[in-house]
From Swiss-Prot:
Pfam families: Fe-S_biosyn. The keyword Metal-binding applies. One of its GO terms (cellular component) is cytosol. Gene3D superfamilies: HesB-like domain (2.60.300.12). NCBIfam families: iron-sulfur cluster assembly accessory protein, PRK13623.1. GO terms for biological process: iron-sulfur cluster assembly. The lineage of its organism: Bacteria, Pseudomonadati, Pseudomonadota, Gammaproteobacteria, Pseudomonadales. This is Iron-sulfur cluster insertion protein ErpA. It comes from Pseudomonas fluorescens (strain SBW25). The gene is erpA. Its cofactor is iron-sulfur cluster. Iron-sulfur cluster binds at C44, C108, C110. Disulfide bonds: none annotated. The keyword Manganese does not apply.
Length: 116
């Protein structure tokens, strides 16, 4: 019997997302704020993404830093987000943080709901 090691695929935090987080943190005047990304049950496809700003980081959170700002993910959410990319997009329909998730087998037209 052989033992295999597993290295989780990193969560990517794009320049555009980091730049927007920095802008929002500067606007609030609180450099302790971090972008927390999470997954909850719900939405039309079974799971949905959520974003919030948070000052607190738990011991078991995953932290991704880029350009002086941090993205934080709890362990339950990370299992669904490993290998995903968090980006910020501006378009005709508005501006928002988006997740490009290779683990999602289906997604909803709204872009915030998915299934695995």
């Amino acid at each position: 019997m052989s033992v295999e090691s597993f290295t989780p695929t990193a969560l990517q935090f794009t320049h555009g997302a980091a730049h927007k987080v920095k802008s929002l943190v500067d606007e609030e005047g609180n450099d302790r704020l971090k972008l927390r990304v999470f997954v909850t049950g719900g939405g039309c496809s079974g799971f949905q993404y959520g974003f919030t700003f948070d000052e607190d980081v738990a011991d078991d959170d995953t932290i991704v830093e880029r350009e002086g700002v941090s993205l934080v993910v709890d362990p339950m959410s990370f299992q669904y987000l490993a290998g995903a990319e968090v980006d910020y997009q501006e378009g005709l329909e508005g501006s928002r943080f988006v997740i490009k998730n290779p683990n999602a087998t289906t997604t909803c037209g709204c872009g915030s709901s998915f299934s695995i």
